From Swiss-Prot:
Function: Component of the tagatose-1,6-bisphosphate aldolase GatYZ that is required for full activity and stability of the Y subunit. Could have a chaperone-like function for the proper and stable folding of GatY. When expressed alone, GatZ does not show any aldolase activity. Is involved in the catabolism of galactitol.
An individual GO BP term: galactitol metabolic process
Keywords associated with the record: Galactitol metabolism
Subunit structure: Forms a complex with GatY.
Keyword Translocase: no
One Gene Ontology cellular component: plasma membrane
Gene: gatZ
Top-level taxon of origin: Bacteria
Protein name: D-tagatose-1,6-bisphosphate aldolase subunit GatZ
Listed PANTHER family: D-TAGATOSE-1,6-BISPHOSPHATE ALDOLASE SUBUNIT GATZ, N-ACETYLGALACTOSAMINE PERMEASE II COMPONENT-RELATED
Record pathway: Carbohydrate metabolism; D-tagatose 6-phosphate degradation; D-glyceraldehyde 3-phosphate and glycerone phosphate from D-tagatose 6-phosphate: step 2/2
Length: 420
C-alpha cells in the first residue's frame, strides 16, 4: 500500500479498488481478474464480518486469511500480491456495551487482525457505546483510535511494521448503503478533515506513537457518493475540489467508502482528486446476484420441472422466513419488500448466500446447466454483455465463467478509474 500511495503522491494517476466481500466467487473473480497483471489486489474484511469471535461469517482473521489464500491457490494468484485489510476495526460490533468493555474487545480485535498478517488497518472508533454522548467528540474518537493503534503496534513484528498502514477518519457512509431514500449527501468539509488529522496526531503523540503516525496513509471522508435501494448519488467533482486541494498538502490520500455503482468516468475523477482508495462491496455481490438470477431463468426454460433447483423460490422463502438481515433496511408491505429483497442496490441477499438451502439450490442449478448447451439466443436475452464476449471469442458459455465475467464488469470500471 505504501508504494502505491507514494506513486500517487508523486503525481501518477494510480489508485486501488478495495474488494470488501467474503463471498468466495467474488474473491475468486477479484484474483482471477488481475491474475495476468502486475497489480496487487486489496481484499478487506469488516469487523462485524470477521472478528476474534467469528463474526457473521464464522471466521476469525486467521481463518479469513487462509480462506483467501486457498482461493488464491485455486486461481493461481501469488499470495505475495494480496493485501489484506481490516475495515471499521473498533467498537462497531459492541456498541451496546459500555466503552471500557467495548474497547477491550476492540483492542483484541485489532491484535487478531495484525497477528493474522493484515497490513491495512482502518482504525474506526467513531461509534458511540452505551452511555456515550451521540455523536462522540472528535478528541474521544482520536484517543480511542490511538489505543487501537497502540494495540496493533504492540503485536506487529519489525517485518510487519514495514508493511503496516493505517487509515483514520470518521465520516463514513452507512456500511452497505443507506437504509432509506436519499436525494443528496453531505460532503466532508476541509475543516472537518483537518480536525480529524489534527486530533489523531495529538492523540497518537500523547501515547508515544509518533512513528506510527508515519504509517497513516489515508483519511476516510465523504466525497459526495452514496446509494440506497434504488437511487445513486453520483460524484460531482466540482463539489469536492476544496478537499482535493487540501490533501495535496499532506503525505496522505483519501479513502472513499460506498463508491459502488458510480460510472467508470467517476472512478477516474475520484482517483484524480486523490480519493485513491475506492471501496466496493454490494456492487460486486449485486453483479453476482444478477448472474445467478439470469442463470435461474435459463434453467427454468431448459431443465425439466422435476429436476430444477427452484433457486429463486428458495432464496425468497429463506429471506422471508429469516428476515434479520434485511427487515430494518427494506420497505414494509409484501410487494415492496419482495422487490427490495430481489433488486435493492443495497443487496442484502449477500448475507444469505452461505445459507445451506440457498447454497444447495445454487449448486443444483449450476450442475443442471453444466450438463446442457445453453443456446446463444438465451445468453443474449439474459446476459447480453457476456453474449458479445462469447461472440468475440473472449468467453465460453459455461455457467461459472458467465458469473465470473458478470463480476468482472464491475472490476473493469474500477480498473479504468484506478489504472495508471
Amino acid at each position: 500500500m505504501k508504494t502505491l500511495i507514494a506513486r500517487h503522491k508523486a503525481g501518477e494517476h494510480i489508485g486501488i479498488c478495495s474488494v470488501c466481500s467474503a463471498h468466495p466467487l467474488v474473491i475468486e473473480a477479484a484474483l482471477a481478474f488481475d491474475r495476468n497483471s502486475t497489480r496487487k489486489v486489496l481484499i478487506e474484511a469488516t469487523s462485524n464480518q470477521v472478528n476474534q469471535f467469528g463474526g457473521y461469517t464464522g471466521m476469525t482473521p486467521a481463518d479469513f486469511r487462509e480462506f483467501v489464500f486457498a482461493i488464491a491457490n485455486k486461481v493461481g494468484f501469488a499470495r505475495e500480491r494480496i493485501i489484506l485489510g481490516g475495515d471499521h476495526l473498533g467498537p462497531n460490533c459492541w456498541q451496546q456495551e459500555n466503552a471500557d468493555a467495548a474497547m477491550e474487545k476492540s483492542v483484541e480485535l485489532v491484535k487478531a487482525y495484525v497477528r493474522a498478517g493484515f497490513s491495512k488497518i482502518h482504525l474506526d472508533a467513531s461509534m458511540s457505546c452505551a452511555g456515550d454522548p451521540i455523536p462522540l467528540a472528535p478528541e474521544t474518537v482520536a484517543e480511542r483510535a490511538a489505543v487501537l493503534c497502540l494495540a496493533a503496534e504492540s503485536v506487529a513484528t519489525d517485518c510487519q511494521r514495514e508493511q503496516l498502514s493505517y487509515v483514520i477518519g470518521t465520516e463514513v457512509p452507512v456500511p452497505g448503503g443507506e437504509a432509506s431514500a436519499i436525494q443528496s449527501v453531505h460532503i466532508t468539509q476541509v475543516e472537518d478533515a483537518a480536525n480529524t488529522l489534527r486530533t489523531h496526531q495529538k492523540a497518537f503523540i500523547a501515547r508515544g506513537l509518533a512513528e506510527a503516525l508515519t504509517r497513516v496513509i489515508a483519511i476516510v471522508v465523504q466525497p459526495g457518493v452514496e446509494f440506497d435501494h434504488s437511487n445513486i448519488i453520483h460524484y460531482q467533482a466540482q463539489e469536492a475540489q476544496a478537499l482535493a486541494q487540501w490533501i495535496e498538502k499532506t503525505k496522505m490520500v483519501y479513502e472513499a467508502h460506498s463508491t459502488d455503482y458510480q460510472t467508470q468516468a467517476a472512478y477516474r475523477e475520484l482517483v484524480r482528486d486523490h480519493f485513491a482508495i475506492l471501496k466496493v462491496g454490494p456492487a460486486l455481490t449485486f453483479a453476482l446476484r444478477e448472474a445467478v438470477f439470469a442463470l435461474a431463468q435459463i434453467e427454468q426454460e431448459l431443465i425439466a420441472p422435476e429436476n430444477r433447483s427452484g433457486c429463486l423460490a428458495v432464496i425468497e422463502e429463506v429471506m422471508l422466513d429469516e428476515p434479520q438481515y434485511w427487515k430494518k433496511y427494506y420497505r414494509t408491505g409484501f410487494h415492496d419488500s419482495l422487490l427490495d429483497i430481489r433488486y435493492s442496490l443495497s443487496d442484502r441477499i449477500r448475507y444469505y448466500w452461505p445459507h445451506s438451502r440457498i447454497k444447495n439450490s445454487v449448486e443444483t442449478m449450476m450442475v443442471n446447466l453444466e450438463g446442457v448447451d445453453i443456446p446463444l439466443g438465451m445468453i443474449s436475452q439474459y446476459l447480453p454483455k457476456q453474449f458479445e464476449r462469447i461472440q468475440s471469442g473472449e468467453l465460453s458459455a459455461i455457467p461459472h465463467q458467465l458469473i465470473m465475467d458478470k463480476i468482472y464488469d464491475v472490476l473493469r470500471a474500477y480498473r479504468y478509474g484506478c489504472a495508471e
